[in-house]
C-alpha cells in the first residue's frame, strides 16, 4: 500500500476532554472544556492547555495565572459537554450544571470542581502564542 500524504492538520485523536476551572483575581470564575491538553515535562512536572484568546476564560487565566485541570467521569459527561458549548459570558456554568467550586490547596484564585475525582492545580509559567490558540 502506498503512503498517503495529507495536508497539515490535527491528527492525534482521541484527545482527553477535561474541565478546566479558572478565576481572575477579583474572584470571577468559569469552567471551560478543553481537549488540547497534555504533558509537557516530567521534572519539573508541567502540563499545558491551549485556549483561543477570544474565549471568556482566556482573560481569567491570564489575570490570575492559575487554572485547575479537572478530570471527568461518565457521570459528568453532560456537564463536560455543556461547559464546552456555552460561554461563561452568558451563563453561570457552576450553577447550571450543579457543580461545586472548592478551595484549591495550592492556588489563591482558581477553584477545583469538587465533583471531579482528580484536580490538577496549575500555575502559569508561560503563555506561548501559537496562532489560533495560546498555550498556557
Question: PLM features: what roles do these ranges have?
Answer:
Residues 1-34, 38-136:
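Active-site-proximal mixed secondary-structure blocks
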